[in-house]
């Protein structure tokens, strides 16, 4: 459960790859394919946030334990966050974002994200938020930043409450119980806690 406020929009965002994804996915693919990083517009950064030449790294010696670099994906059409993301600062580093993989929205089950929330019509959402925010920036502004390939943070004048709940079981307006797929596997944990509590 997250209850927070949507505070700003980032146009043409970088994707700062979480460490777990960097070592479990990007590192594995980079070791297998020397062109992977360049083809997918990934930068490797040191602790000073300086971009390194991937060829200067001995990838054969890199492991999940000694990979001490940061990974960042350049903005653009292939960026995993698409052209825009929506930030509501929270301890889980979860946000809403555009996506280049629009075909996922045609699937009945769409839980393919690493944890953040993909938005099907992200530019439309940005347009709606800015228009109702009476913001000096507009959808045309965002498109201009995209065309110029420039990351830009756009603060909202009016912060918007946002609530995210995970409820694989709900009741409809008629009182019927509806069960959805427990994509995060939390039902079993809850059942185990209830059983343990009942034995006390």
Question: What name fits each language-model region?
Answer:
Residues 1-200:
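Well-ordered beta-sheet/strand-loop patches within structured domains
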């Amino acid at each position: 459960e997250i209850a927070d406020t949507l505070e700003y929009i980032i146009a043409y965002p970088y994707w700062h790859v979480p460490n777990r994804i960097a070592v479990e996915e990007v590192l594995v693919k980079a070791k297998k394919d020397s062109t992977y990083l360049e083809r997918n517009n990934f930068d490797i950064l040191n602790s000073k946030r300086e971009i390194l030449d991937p060829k200067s790294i001995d990838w054969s010696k890199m492991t999940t334990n000694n990979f001490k670099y940061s990974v960042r994906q350049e903005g653009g059409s292939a960026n995993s966050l698409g052209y825009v993301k929506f930030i509501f600062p929270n301890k889980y580093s979860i946000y809403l974002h555009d996506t280049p993989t629009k075909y996922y929205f045609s699937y009945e089950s769409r839980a393919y994200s690493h944890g953040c929330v993909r938005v099907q019509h992200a530019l439309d959402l940005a347009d709606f938020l800015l228009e109702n925010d009476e913001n000096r920036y507009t959808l045309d502004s965002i498109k201009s930043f995209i065309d110029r390939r420039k990351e830009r943070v756009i603060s909202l004048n009016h912060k918007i409450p946002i609530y995210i709940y995970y409820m694989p079981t709900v009741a409809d307006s008629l009182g019927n119980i509806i069960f959805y797929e427990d994509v995060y596997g939390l039902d079993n944990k809850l059942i185990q806690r209830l059983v343990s509590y009942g034995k006390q």
